[in-house]
């Protein structure tokens, strides 16, 4: 499908900035909500990138989910003339705040009454006698 260069560039920029793109399976939708180009052009451009191995496509409940592969990141970086330091949002490490370790209270010891029931010694009261030999005799009134 022939897609104007500015539309193709807008699709590639949106895909590279986030690393993922979602498109509704509606070929008659006048504009894609995120990119601003016709939805058919978004789907076909992503289909083209998928056939070359630059995207992974998932389809679920009427929506296409496109995810960039590592080869796709390299291809779009070259296509959009971006430096190697620029990466999609999905490839960036998220910095999580660490909780302070010093503020935690020490674990308390269990009460002695609690320890007696938790660590009771095991007894062999429930074992069968040494001469016990079970045998199968049929069952439920069936002949042997």
Swiss-Prot record:
Subcellular locations according to the entry: Cytoplasm
Gene Ontology process terms (BP): cytoplasmic translation
Keyword flag Cytoplasm: yes
Superkingdom field: Eukaryota
UniProt GO MF annotations: RNA binding; structural constituent of ribosome
Keyword line: Cytoplasm, Ribonucleoprotein, Ribosomal protein
Biased composition range(s): Basic and acidic residues: 103-126
Chain spans, region Disordered: 90-144
Stated role: Component of the ribosome, a large ribonucleoprotein complex responsible for the synthesis of proteins in the cell. The small ribosomal subunit (SSU) binds messenger RNAs (mRNAs) and translates the encoded message by selecting cognate aminoacyl-transfer RNA (tRNA) molecules. The large subunit (LSU) contains the ribosomal catalytic site termed the peptidyl transferase center (PTC), which catalyzes the formation of peptide bonds, thereby polymerizing the amino acids delivered by tRNAs into a polypeptide chain.
Subunit annotation: Component of the small ribosomal subunit (SSU). Mature yeast ribosomes consist of a small (40S) and a large (60S) subunit. The 40S small subunit contains 1 molecule of ribosomal RNA (18S rRNA) and at least 33 different proteins. The large 60S subunit contains 3 rRNA molecules (25S, 5.8S and 5S rRNA) and at least 46 different proteins. eS10 interacts with GCN1 (via middle region); this interaction is direct and promotes GCN2 kinase activity.
Recorded family membership: Belongs to the eukaryotic ribosomal protein eS10 family.
Additional observations: There are 2 genes for eS10 in S.pombe.
PANTHER family reported in the protein's UniProt record: 40S RIBOSOMAL PROTEIN S10, RIBOSOMAL PROTEIN S10
Protein name according to UniProt: Small ribosomal subunit protein eS10A
Species assigned in the record: Schizosaccharomyces pombe (strain 972 / ATCC 24843) (Fission yeast)
Lineage: Eukaryota, Fungi, Dikarya, Ascomycota, Taphrinomycotina
């Amino acid at each position: 499908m022939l897609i104007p260069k500015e539309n193709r560039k807008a699709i590639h920029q949106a895909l590279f900035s986030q690393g993922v793109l979602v498109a509704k399976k509606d070929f008659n939708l006048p504009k894609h909500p995120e990119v601003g180009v016709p939805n058919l052009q978004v789907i076909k451009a992503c289909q083209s990138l998928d056939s070359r191995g630059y995207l992974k496509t998932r389809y679920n409940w009427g929506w296409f989910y496109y995810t960039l592969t590592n080869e796709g990141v390299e291809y779009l970086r070259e296509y959009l003339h971006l430096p190697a330091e620029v990466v999609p949002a999905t490839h960036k490490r998220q910095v999580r705040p660490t909780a302070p370790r010093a503020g935690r209270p020490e674990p308390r010891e269990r009460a002695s009454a609690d320890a007696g029931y938790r660590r009771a010694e095991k007894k062999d009261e429930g074992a069968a006698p040494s001469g016990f030999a079970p045998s199968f005799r049929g069952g439920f009134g069936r002949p042997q």
